[in-house]
């Protein structure tokens, strides 16, 4: 299975990079992982809604360039569906069983995802109603993907 994580912005903090590297290493046993970072646009202070939408559109266009036609796209969105870790593992397994061997997870920037990206998504997923820094969220997503594969393989880890 091929899994891409397409996210806005670069990871700067060493502790987050270390966690991403660790989960990437762990996931190499289960899938081919590709982490893609697209540039984030600077948001001016007191930006209008129109300015924010333009920024999301620019970031969205960069994201869409990295999504393959055959990808099952899962957008991480506050308005998405909240599911358990078991349901998440079922979602990944159902992709595989229905011939979707390529999953693209999309993490937006500080303003979220553009309408174009959300409309391309096959599934909208929310981890919580709370807001998280998108850099930290990448680690959380990798951990849940790793947990999902451990669940699917019946291996100890999930508790």
Swiss-Prot record:
InterPro entries listed in its UniProt record: Alpha/beta_knot_MTases, RlmH-like, tRNA_m1G_MTases_N
Any single Pfam family the record assigns to this protein: SPOUT_MTase
Binding site for S-adenosyl-L-methionine: 76, 108, 127-132
Leader sequence residues: none
EC numbers for this chain: 2.1.1.177
This protein's UniProt keywords: Cytoplasm, Methyltransferase, rRNA processing, S-adenosyl-L-methionine, Transferase
One of the record's GO molecular function terms: rRNA (pseudouridine-N3-)-methyltransferase activity
GO cellular component, one term: cytoplasm
Cell compartment(s), UniProt: Cytoplasm
Record's catalysed reaction(s): pseudouridine(1915) in 23S rRNA + S-adenosyl-L-methionine = N(3)-methylpseudouridine(1915) in 23S rRNA + S-adenosyl-L-homocysteine + H(+)
Taxonomic superkingdom: Bacteria
Keyword hit for S-adenosyl-L-methionine: yes
EC supergroup of this enzyme: transferase
Cross-referenced PANTHER family: METHYLTRANSFERASE, RIBOSOMAL RNA LARGE SUBUNIT METHYLTRANSFERASE H
Family recorded in the similarity comment: Belongs to the RNA methyltransferase RlmH family.
Function statement: Specifically methylates the pseudouridine at position 1915 (m3Psi1915) in 23S rRNA.
Subunit structure: Homodimer.
Protein name as annotated: Ribosomal RNA large subunit methyltransferase H
Record lineage: Bacteria, Bacillati, Bacillota, Clostridia, Eubacteriales
């Amino acid at each position: 299975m091929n899994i891409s994580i397409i996210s806005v912005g670069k990871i700067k903090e060493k502790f987050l990079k270390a966690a991403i590297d660790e989960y990437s290493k762990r996931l190499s046993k289960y899938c081919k992982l590709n982490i893609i970072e697209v540039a984030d646009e600077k948001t001016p202070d007191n930006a209008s809604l129109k300015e924010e939408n333009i920024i999301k559109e620019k970031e969205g266009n960069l994201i869409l360039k990295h999504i393959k036609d055959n990808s099952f796209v899962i957008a991480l969105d506050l308005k998405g569906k909240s599911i358990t870790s078991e349901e998440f593992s079922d979602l990944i397994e159902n992709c595989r069983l229905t011939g979707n061997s390529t999953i693209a997870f999309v993490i937006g920037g500080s303003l979220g995802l553009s309408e174009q990206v959300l409309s391309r998504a096959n599934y909208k997923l929310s981890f919580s109603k709370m807001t998280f820094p998108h850099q930290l969220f990448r680690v959380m997503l990798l951990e849940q993907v790793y947990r999902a594969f451990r669940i699917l393989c019946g291996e100890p880890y999930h508790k």
